[in-house]
Design a protein with these regions (language model features):
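Functionally important transmembrane alpha-helices
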Residues: 109-175
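Acidic (Asp/Glu-rich) catalytic motifs at the cytosolic membrane interface
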Residues: 87-95
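Interfacial helix-capping/hinge residues at the ends of transmembrane alpha-helices
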Residues: 18, 95, 99, 136-140
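Membrane-embedded alpha-helical segments of multi-pass membrane proteins
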Residues: 1-2, 72, 76, 80, ...
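Juxtamembrane helix-loop-helix connectors linking adjacent transmembrane helices
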Residues: 15-86, 104, 173-175
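Alpha-helical transmembrane segments in multi-pass membrane proteins
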Residues: 1-14
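Hydrophobic alpha-helical transmembrane segments of integral membrane proteins
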Residues: 1-2, 83-84, 122
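Membrane-interfacial alpha-helical segments at the cytosolic side of multi-pass membrane proteins
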Residues: 95-106, 164-170
Length: 175
């Protein structure tokens, strides 16, 4: 659903190619270094926020794994939907389309902050707003620093996939 407005209003309407939303080559070493740094910052922020929430007996997000079914089939479905398709679509829309449009009208600082805010708010759960805001800023920063959407897609996909894998392993160890 997120890719349709990008294609219809952005690409088709203006006769643009997918490179205009960030599908461009990038320096692999730079992308890897910046991607690892973004991941480390994201994990640090998430851990700190989780510790703050634990003081109030709250969690950042509910366990989404049961929504995909049980067992290994549920894990595979979660990895496909939440680890590949979701991050791809979200990055194309929020960074490739929305952030790129913001950069035409706003300073880098305001475009990063507004993109992070919109990305957080769309995820609905208030206890998850701070870490998701941080992710939105970091993913937009990756696009800005590498000139390509691919590093943000890879890091986003890695974070979501790792989360599902850890939930799955955690459930198995708790049995």
């Amino acid at each position: 659903g997120l890719l349709l407005p990008v294609w219809w209003f952005g690409l088709r309407r203006h006769g643009l190619g997918w490179s205009s939303v960030g599908f461009r080559p990038f320096n692999m070493v730079r992308g890897l270094v910046l991607g690892c740094a973004a991941w480390a910052l994201a994990m640090t922020g998430t851990v700190i926020w989780s510790l703050v929430l634990s003081l109030f007996n709250l969690r950042t997000q509910p366990n989404m794994l049961p929504l995909f079914g049980g067992g290994i089939g549920g894990l595979v479905a979660a990895l496909l939907a939440g680890g590949l398709v979701g991050p791809f679509a979200e990055e194309v829309f929020f960074r490739g389309y929305l952030f790129a449009g913001m950069r035409q009208h706003l300073s880098l600082k305001w475009a990063l902050l507004l993109n992070g805010l919109i990305f957080a708010l769309i995820h609905i759960l208030p206890t998850s707003y701070p870490p998701i805001f941080l992710l939105g800023v970091l993913f937009a920063g990756l696009l800005e620093l590498t000139g390509s959407l691919w590093p943000a897609i890879f890091v986003h996909s890695f974070i979501n996939s790792l989360s599902f894998l850890l939930l799955y392993v955690g459930e198995r160890l708790a049995l």
